[in-house]
């Protein structure tokens, strides 16, 4: 599905590790084994690569140098992007207790508030819905954009990262 979405938007796309046989889900591929994507992005000279888990509710990214962009990075990047555009309505990004301390320090430096929940996108969304927050997620790449969904969506996360790249 991701390739169809990106192709429809005019992106040049490559797909790797997309031949499921019923037994090989996430087998040395996807968001839990991102090394192959890192190598592929660098060797092909690509701008970005996106890795999804088996049900595509998680997304991690690889930049042009092969660096992994975790869910914490995505929350920071898109949280700042939203704030710059006046779309971070509560000025709060929702995270879990597993997020890196550096994320909170970076949010503090940008004047962005944050909330910590128990691990699980269920708890992240619960807090978001109760408090009117627009973005939240987990280090693992479950990113929730409450304007569009109540759970993580890897393809949506990819599109949002591309939006920032093209801004």
Where are these regions (language model features)?
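Phosphate-binding chemistry for phosphorylated carbohydrates and sugar-nucleotides
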Residues: 1-165
């Amino acid at each position: 599905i991701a390739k169809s979405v990106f192709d429809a938007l005019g992106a040049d796309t490559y797909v790797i590790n997309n031949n499921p046989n019923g037994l090989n889900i996430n087998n040395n591929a996807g968001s839990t084994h991102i090394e192959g994507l890192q190598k592929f992005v660098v060797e092909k000279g690509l701008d970005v690569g996106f890795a999804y888990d088996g049900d595509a509710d998680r997304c991690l990214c690889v930049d042009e140098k092969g660096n992994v962009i975790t869910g914490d990075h995505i929350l920071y990047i898109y949280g700042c992007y939203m704030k710059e555009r006046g779309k971070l309505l509560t000025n709060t990004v929702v995270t879990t207790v597993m997020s890196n301390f550096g994320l909170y320090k970076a949010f503090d430096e940008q004047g962005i508030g944050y909330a910590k929940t128990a691990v699980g996108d269920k708890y992240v969304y619960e807090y978001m819905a109760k408090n009117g927050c627009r973005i939240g997620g987990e280090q693992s790449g479950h990113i929730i954009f409450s304007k569009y969904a109540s759970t993580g969506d890897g393809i949506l996360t990819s599109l949002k990262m591309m939006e920032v790249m093209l801004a």
